[in-house]
Each structure stands twice: as C-alpha cells, then as structure tokens.
Design a protein with these regions (language model features):
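Generic cytosolic/nucleocytoplasmic N-terminal low-complexity/intrinsically disordered segments
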Residues: 2, 24-26
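Acidic/polar surface patches and capping/hinge elements
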Residues: 27-442
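Bacterial N-terminal signal peptides that target proteins for export
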Residues: 1-9
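Repetitive helical segments and hydrophobic/amphipathic motifs
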Residues: 12-13
C-alpha cells in the first residue's frame, strides 16, 4: 500500500473576476467522465510530453547523475510529480503519492512544467542551466497571470513532497562490491573494459509500488547440463558472433539500433508518439508517463534483485570458457560478441524486461496492441518500423541475442518478470474516473 502525503491548505482562492473568466477550466467533480482532448488540435505537444522529451535529453548527458543510480528512478520520480500535480488540479484520478488539495483554477500545464523542473533540478543538478532554460521556454508558451503563477507554485510544492518521500529510498547508497565466484555458470567481469559489476545496490532501493524487490524474483536459470541451455548457447554462439555468417543484415541492424540508446529512453519515445497519435489530454499524458516510468523503475529493482541472486555468466564468458559445464556445447576461445557486453550478470535480460513492461503498459493504456510507428537513431543511422507495441518489444528481445549479449533463457525470463511487474503496478495505482488509461475507479 502506498502511503500518500497530505498537503493541506495549498489551494489558493482566486479573485471573483478571474473565477468567472476561468470557469471553463474549473476542476471537475471526480465522478464526471469527460476530459477535453485539446491536444490533437494543438500545433505543439502539451507540457507533459515536452517535459518528457526534455527528461530524455538531459538524462543521457554523460555524468548527469551518479552511475550507481538507475536512470529509471529519475524518470519515475519526475513523472509521478507531474502526474500528482496535474491530477491535483483536474481531479481526474487518484493521486499516486501526494494527497493533493490543488488550486481549482490553476493551470495544469504550468503545474506540469513546474513539477518536472523542480524534480529534475534536484535529481540532475549538473543539468540545472539547461533545465531552467527549458522552463522559461515553457512559460513563454503557457503565458502569464494568476492561473499560471498558481500552477507553478503548486507544481513545485507537489514535486518537493515527492522528492522528500524518495530521499531516503536507498538509491544514494554507494555501489556494493561484487566479487565474482569461480566456476562454470558464474558471472565474470566482461571484456574489454573488465569494469566492476554495475548497479549492485539497485535491488536495495525501496520499490515505488512492489511490496519488495524479490516479489517477482525470477526462477533459477536452466541448469548448464540441460538441453535448453545447450540450445540457447548454440543459438547465441552462431547469431551473436562479431563476424557471424548466419546473422542477416536486418538482424545486424536490429542489434545495432537497440544497442545504441538506453532502452527506457526508446520506450518513452514510443509513448510520446502514441500520445500524440491517439490525441491524449494533458491528464491522460500525465497518467501514461507516470504509469510507464514507474513500471520501468520497479522493473529495474526487480531485475537487479534477480541478477545478483543468480549472478549467471554472460555469453562472452560462457562461450570462451574451457569448462562449459555441458558435454553438448562446444566452446570457442576466440569468440567475440557483435557488441561489447554490459557489466552485470546476464540473467534475466534487461532489454527484454524493460521492453515487455513498457509494451504491457502501452497496450493497457490505449486498449490495443496495434500502433504503427517508426524509430530512428541518427547516431547509428538506423530506422526501425513497427505495427504494434509487442512487435517492438519482441524485436528488442531478439536484439540482445543478435548482439551476443544474452541467451534466450535470459530474455524469456526478463519478459515474464517485466510483464508481472507492470501488471502489478497498474493494478495498484493510477486509478482514474472514466477517461482513457489503465484501470477505471472501482
């Protein structure tokens, strides 16, 4: 159960002359179902989408936050602050954390921008100049006046409450030393960098919604002497080799695309496109991104709980090992993966988990899996086309085999865990009152 914070007495009373002029924007009663869909007719995305895009931008700047803090935490805190600020004014759903008494006539767009700015300034202090400059751009779009001033003040107070709630969640603790165990199946530091194991303390972070990091812990991976392991070993050895002759050009493009940007950023880009295409209202967008990024953050916590419970080796270690642990696998000491291997255990697979969680959220929110979209990464000059959320998720899953990063059992486990985490998050949060997105109020 999420303990909500009460902000009592934050709603200011507007002057009567402004009240009559702004009556169309009054906070609707919670039993009403209608939400105005003004975004589709607008020439630019609303502030929720614009700040989600800014979040993606500043989060990937090298050194923007400590390497030990998982980026999905920053995304979730920011989007929860935006959601609670917007919902507090429009009253179209249950708050996630802050039991809000929002100013009835305040601008929800100003509140969204202010909440995002406040959260990001605190979480990414090195990026404050860029964040504050973007905030001024937002205000130029929104306008000025008492409604905007109230929205700005309210968004700041809500975000500050969310930040205070997460200040002692364990994310700031230093990375835990991980000393690899010897023997077949055990994770070893991966070449070429042989960097220390990463995100070792993420499983100790307090989840946003899950009851514990191990609530949906993955089952043990297949035994090294099993037929499944041998089959998955052979698949990655063939398709994931750096100079593979069995991997097609399209499969190489898939591996290149999904390895070129953080997968949680890619799925926020998908959500941006879908939000525009489906004509979401501002409150729907606030709910969408809060549900998406909270699911991704709790997926990260669950993922690393499983990774460091089993500390299973990566293909680069398994395939080049002298002792394979299975008479039906044939190693190759000269084998290299198509892409350099991440510095954490292989099981479960992160791309599969995050992608399954994200696609589950998007299917649930929009009520359909069908959505045609394109994703381009100009850094590697690759564009991928999709006709469904699940199609993109499946491709992200396969990409890590083509890249030589994972075995199929890693990916299958990640998919199952991501689906379960997202389902739990959406079943227990973000209830709404008749408009689009997740589960209606019961």
């Amino acid at each position: 159960m999420i303990k909500r914070i009460a902000l009592v007495g934050t709603a200011a009373v507007m002057a009567m002359s402004l009240a009559m002029a702004a009556i169309a924007n009054a906070r609707p009663a919670r039993h009403r179902h209608h939400v105005a869909r003004t975004h589709a007719a607008s020439t630019q995305p609303d502030q929720v989408i614009q700040w989600n895009e800014e979040l993606q931008k500043v989060l990937v700047v090298p050194g923007a936050q400590p390497a030990s803090i998982h980026p999905t935490r920053t995304m979730a805190i920011t989007q929860i602050a935006v959601y609670d600020a917007v919902t507090g004014i429009l009253g179209q759903g249950e708050p996630f954390l802050v039991d809000i008494r929002g100013p009835r006539f305040a601008s929800p767009e100003a509140a969204a921008a202010s909440a995002a700015r406040t959260a990001l300034d605190a979480l990414l202090p090195s990026q404050q100049p860029a964040i504050d400059a973007f905030f001024q751009t937002s205000l130029a779009q929104i306008g000025s006046g008492p409604r905007v001033d109230q929205g700005v003040a309210y968004g700041q107070r809500v975000a500050s409450a969310v930040l205070a709630n997460r200040a002692s969640d364990g994310a700031a603790q230093p990375a835990l030393a991980f000393i690899p165990f010897p023997g077949p199946g055990e994770y070893q530091l991966t070449p070429p960098a042989l960097a220390p194991a990463g995100f070792t303390q993420v499983a100790n972070v307090t989840p946003f919604v899950l009851r514990s990091a191990g609530q949906f812990r993955a089952p043990a991976p297949p035994a090294l002497d099993s037929a499944q392991y041998a089959a998955d070993f052979s698949q990655t050895k063939s398709l994931g080799e750096k100079t593979s002759t069995t991997r097609t050009a399209d499969e190489t493009a898939i591996a290149t695309f999904w390895g070129a940007a953080p997968v949680w950023v890619v799925w926020n880009q998908v959500a941006d496109q879908a939000a525009v295409a489906f004509g979401n209202s501002v409150v729907e967008n606030a709910r969408l991104f809060a549900g998406l990024d909270t699911s991704l953050a709790d997926s990260a916590i669950a993922l690393y709980d499983s990774k460091y419970t089993y500390h299973r080796w990566r293909p680069i270690t398994a395939i080049t090992a002298t002792d394979q642990g299975n008479p039906n696998t044939v190693g190759d000491p000269n084998w290299l993966p198509f892409a350099n291997t991440a510095n954490d255990p292989g099981y479960p697979g992160a791309h599969a988990e995050f992608s399954q969680a994200a696609s589950s959220v998007l299917r649930d929110f929009f009520g359909t899996d069908r959505f045609s979209f394109a994703l381009t990464n100009p850094t590697v000059n690759v564009t991928r086309m999709f006709t469904s959320f699940s199609g993109a998720s499946d491709e992200a899953n396969a990409s890590r085999i083509f890249a030589g990063q994972h075995f199929q059992y890693d990916e299958s486990s990640g998919q199952r865990q991501g689906s379960r985490v997202a389902g739990f998050v959406l079943d227990h949060t973000f209830e709404h009152f008749g408009d689009r997105g997740f589960h209606p109020h019961r």
